[in-house]
Amino acid sequence: MTEVPPIPVLHLEGGWQVAVEDWKRCSGRLRLRDGGVDAGVHVERCAAGRLRDAYPVGARDVEVQVTDAVADEALTALLRELAEAVQRADPECRRVVYAAPEGDADQVAAAECAGFRRVVDVDLADRQLSLLVVEPDWVTRTDIDLDHVPET
């Protein structure tokens, strides 16, 4: 079993005020404020959290959960900033994951506007979720030369 690295400390840009409510090795709770937005956020290594058995998680994958109701435009801005903050704090993170309730078209659309891509619907013990991810270019980049074997 691969050891799960600690969750990185996130530094948000763009005027967000951040208050740490709780921080542990693999998860943390933040209170974020910007203008009229006041939102609770939970960040967690997927391999140590509720999604650990939901898909083939990477040790460095991070789930971001917005725990308070936020308007769609504000949710988009918040998710975009959280994804960027995770990628700045942990350049080896392969996936930033946002789990929307399955069938919630508004949350899925807000996440997609923030740069997330819908990848799979999963069933947890108590709910069904649509997983959306942001992945860095080094994960999604492909070599279109099919005759070339990488690193040869």
What are these regions (language model features)?
Residues 96-107, 124-126:
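Conserved beta-strand-loop-alpha-helix junction that forms the acyl-donor binding cleft
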Residues 1-38, 46-49, 56, 140-152:
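Actinobacteria-biased recognition of intrinsically disordered, low-complexity terminal regions
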Residues 132-138:
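Short, cationic-aromatic polyanion-contact patches
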Residues 86-100:
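Conserved GNAT acetyl-CoA-binding A-motif
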Residues 72-87, 113:
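Conserved acetyl-CoA-binding loop-helix of GNAT-fold acetyltransferases
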Residues 110-111, 116:
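Conserved active-site tyrosine of GNAT-family acetyltransferases
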Residues 52-70, 130-132:
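Conserved acetyl-CoA binding element of GNAT-fold acetyltransferases
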Residues 117-131:
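Conserved catalytic-core motifs of GNAT/GCN5-like acyltransferases
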